[in-house]
């Protein structure tokens, strides 16, 4: 059977990607951050969240050894982070400054590939952190990429609907046009090579798309040095666009997440549906298997990440699991699993104390407890009140507390905020919404900064803006004002 063991709720916006290493889990979000957890107890690491991207983070992936994490963003960069310190090791600027939608390491981590919204592909030499080759698929966005197990080729998937196979010299080896009607959303090779009946090397590839289908392909390297790609299975276990898919470490199982809010688990060889998991409240955008434990992580637009455990001998074909919340017991002295930082003003005194312990501020918990500090009082504190009323004598300690409080105040998005009130670039509530030439509304300051640095292309469509004229959206501004005053 499959059981839900933990729900992580650290992000303030849509979760876009989840990735496991041997002992870590990374999640990234439209809130511009990356969270990193221990995969043993799912406590958040001391240096998490990672903040460095200027816009939403679309994808993240670990190097083979787990020492590095790569993340890519609308800000046109792929960042490399040290998992020892949480520090930025390198910032790789995508050719043409296009938003970067996807990134992937080769199995030996010698190469890193990234795909852009303008159809550009960058192949990086990871050892030297230098650009090795570039390629392009015209009139589309690259939203999926994955290396073959041998590391000598990689696949890309686009919003146009095609799958394309490339070698490390960016030679185009094969194109499977119209692989998914309306566009590909994800593609991943199984981790192991196979041999065909004629002795040729074969790879299994899973892909999913806006056509609500999950497909399994056999990619064969023919003796004549040609490439043959055959459709082996078409899986129809979900009723809406399938946004993500991932193989288990042994290649025996396949998981997928969908707009219909479900997670499906298949036996990969025959495409047999094993489980349908119901838990998320919105689209399931990301999924991944742990390489070292029978665990699945799923991420969603409901801002949460669910951790599922696969029990040995799971074979209940087609079983649909009920929508039940599972408890998770936290151990003392670490960050509480799934502790929400939204609506701080509504925190109870106990939640404030839990937050202090999470932030390593145990030294002031007695003072806060004796003064009955709840969320509303927490936000009103100053250095002066910490000294005069709470009698915290250490200047350094007062400064640390105020720094953490200021970080809480910077959280811009609250539960229940209508999505149309959020700027597509910053994902923050708009104060001065304007309509750009692409028809979308943005925060004025954000779109002006975008236009000045992004060669006048639309943040939403990546097509050229016919004019830089911005029209105030007074109707939206009034709607935001009415909503905010009612909260």
Curated annotation (Swiss-Prot):
WD repeats (start-end): 10-47, 52-93, 95-134, 137-176, 179-227, 237-276, 279-318
Domain SAM residues, every copy: 347-411
Keyword Repeat: yes
Coiled-coil region list: none
Origin: domain of life: Eukaryota
Record-linked SMART domains: SAM, Ubox, WD40
GO biological process: protein ubiquitination
Family annotation (Pfam families): SAM_2, U-box, WD40
Assigned keywords, A-Z: Repeat, WD repeat
Chain ranges of the U-box domain: 416-487
Single GO molecular function: ubiquitin-protein transferase activity
Gene3D superfamilies (UniProt xref): Transcription Factor, Ets-1 (1.10.150.50), YVTN repeat-like/Quinoprotein amine dehydrogenase (2.130.10.10), Zinc/RING finger domain, C3HC4 (zinc finger) (3.30.40.10)
Record-given protein name: WD repeat, SAM and U-box domain-containing protein 1
Species of provenance: Danio rerio (Zebrafish)
Gene: wdsub1
